Amino acid sequence: RATTLPSAAVLLLAMLYNTPIYAQTSSSLPRLTADEPLPTKSDITTDKTLLGDWGGLRPWLDNYGVSFTLNQTSDYVGNTRGGIRQGFVYDGLLDLEVDMDLNKAIGWRGGKLHITGYGIQGQDLSIQYVGNLMTTTNVESQPSIAKLGEAWFEQRLMDDHLGLRVGLLEADRYYMMSPTANVFVNSTFGFPDSWEANMPGGGPGYPNATPGALARLDFNDDWRLTASVMNGTPVGPSTSATAY
């Protein structure tokens, strides 16, 4: 699967966070003194994020290494001729990612935590209407469900050139991907569906993250070496005659 943003996608660059941070009395919280100016009002025309700095909460969390990213991809696609039947369907994906820089949080140099959550929406045009092998959009998946995606710990070493990652991983985030294909919708532009179609349950790819470990050595901005070991049956043993 290519992690792409189609033209119909709605990109949200922030999420609401309802922790009653101002009700706390910890001395570690930021406070204004009489000599400090009041915070300026958030302005959507100049802010880097859609919902501003959440009244100062976003930069406070950033000081502790915590950041959020929320993306909503929405597609309305259809089959007008041939295939199984004709019709149009909606499919979408809500992608929430939370990152924590452990160096900022607890002083763990080179450490990072990452969690991805998926909210899969709508119907699958490929299965229900077309009957094709390579999915019409790269967010298609059944059933519609909220589930955990990637969740891993990473340690950076060798002046940040070597990364060791362990946890729940998706192979289609690391292999056989072209950055220039990320603007396209059809999954043929991303991770090879022919490879996924020949693995039980589609293999360790979206939306089924599996236990694994990965090492990546960055030689420079253009060259890197990646090696990993992952569970190849993310949905359990196959019930086919091959009995994977």
Residue ranges and their predicted role:
Residues 50-51, 64, 78, 88-94, ...:
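Residues that define the transmembrane beta-barrel architecture of outer-membrane proteins
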Residues 45, 52-68, 101-113, 158-161, ...:
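Short loop/turn motifs that connect adjacent beta-strands in outer-membrane beta-barrel proteins
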Residues 125-152, 160-244:
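Surface-exposed coil loops of outer-membrane beta-barrel proteins
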Residues 19-23:
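Sec/Tat signal peptide C-region and signal peptidase I cleavage site
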Residues 7-17:
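Bacterial N-terminal signal peptides
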